[in-house]
Amino acid sequence: MDTATHFAMGFGLAGLAYLDPVVASTPSLAVAVMIGTVIGSQAPDLDGLVRLRGTAAYIRNHRGVSHSVPALFLWTGAIFVLIQAIMPQLHWLHLLGWIFLAVCLHVFVDLFNSYGTKGLYPFRDKWVALNAIFIFDPSIFAAHLVGFMLWAAGAHPGHVFLWIYVIIAGYYYWRCQAQRRTTELVRQRIGKAGTFTIIPTLSWTYWTFVAKTDQHWYVGEVISGDVVILDTFSIKPENERIAAAKKSYKVQSFLAFTHHVHVETKERSFGYEVKWIDLRYRSRFQGKSHYMFVAVVYLDFDLTIRDSFVGWIHRGEEQLTKKLDSKRS
């Protein structure tokens, strides 16, 4: 989820904690729990600091081991030690438990969007993305805002957020069911065996999809149950240009993150351009469609890497051209 929703959930858990009689009857503990749940709801995303090492490092590591099973305990322990050092609590087990719940909830809800996490690492070294909830869901955020207003108006925060989280749990179930129904619609439309990835958007009735069969990739959208195929790509075998370009660390980071990839090669005046596109992120800019998340390598005619790029392109091919230098060695 987005940062704002994680913050909202942190405060929401602080309200829910008032169901704990010890928290409710100990003001200093209630404050410590609020600090712990808010920090815990953000902590796994501190891996965003790896962006300072470049986009490739960020892509490879963001929501990776920081969202893994061992990290749940490491984040919890670090936050607990910090709070105990600043404001020691006699009922420290209660504090520890609520911090742990906040960290776990962060990782759990991140599993449901299209970006996904390595939430099952080390038991499974793959990204898990359940594709049921958009990265920012107005309904979930609005539910928390209603809860905060009721809390401010004098309602019991524990009771308020208990009901809110029951409703949100039901909402998650409904969205998962909608995603399954949409998957079946796409499967019927493609009419071939394959893998089908259905991707949520801000709208409840609008989904995008990527489907892979033995010979093709299909990219499209589902609007109120109507399936539309927008792009079709033939799956081609790897050649020596692609193999040479895959030696780039940026490309390796890109391929470690996504498996919804189509690769294209093009001969240029300086040699070759090899471009991978993540088919999940199709967009339009000034009336032209393009894929926003890409990895591109420039090779000379000896298949030596001249330049490379990985990242997001929001304004089309012109923006990409400005980021690469065919003369660099």
Model-derived features: where do they sit?
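N-terminal membrane-targeting hydrophobic helices
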Residues: 1-189, 194-201, 210-213, 218
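C-terminal regulatory/interaction regions
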Residues: 188-329
